[in-house]
Amino acid sequence: SAASDVYKRQELKMLSMKEAIENYVEGCVGKVDCPAYKLFMKAILAGMMIAFGAAGSSVAAHDIVNVGIARLVAGVVFPMGLMMVVMTGAELFTGDCLAIMATVQKKHTALKLIRMLIVVYLGNLLGSLMLTCIDYVSGQYNYSSGILGAYTIKVALGKCNLDFTTALASGILCNILVCAAVM
C-alpha cells in the first residue's frame, strides 16, 4: 500500500557505536575550523538555551513541597535546554569536550581544539549570564511572592557548597550524559 511505502522510505538507520563515533569525529573537523565569531555566536545561543532549561526547571519545581517530586520535575524540564542545543546545532562546551576524539585521531591539532573550547566556554558563559540578567529584569524571580528567587538562590548555594570531589564527580557524570546526547 502507499502508506507502507511512505513508512519504508522514512525508516531511519540506526548507527553502530563505531559509526556514531566516526560521524562525530568527522563533524569535529569542521567545528574546530569554524571561524571564532561563528563559534562564539552559536555558543552564546547554547548558553542561553541551557539557562532556559535551568530557569524552566526552577519555575516548574520551586513550589513543590515534596523534595523527591520537585527534583523529578526539575529533572524532566531541564533537558529541554539540551534538546534545544542539539536540535539547533548550537555549541555547548560540555559536548564539545568530546572533540578530543578527533584530536587523538590526528584529524586536527590540539591547539585548534583548545581554541574552540575556549571560544565556546566564553560564549556559553556570556549566553547564560545574558539570560540570567533578562530573567532578573523581567521580574521572574519575584514569581510566587519571591519564592522562585529564594529557590534559585538555594539551588545556587547548594552547588557552590559542594566539596571539590563531589563537584568533580557530578560534573563528570553530567558530561557523560551530555556527550551521549550530542553523539
Model region roles, listed by residue range:
Residues E11-M183:
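Alpha-helical transmembrane segments and their helix-helix packing motifs
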Residues S1-Y7:
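Short, small-residue-biased leader/transition segments that mark boundaries at the very start
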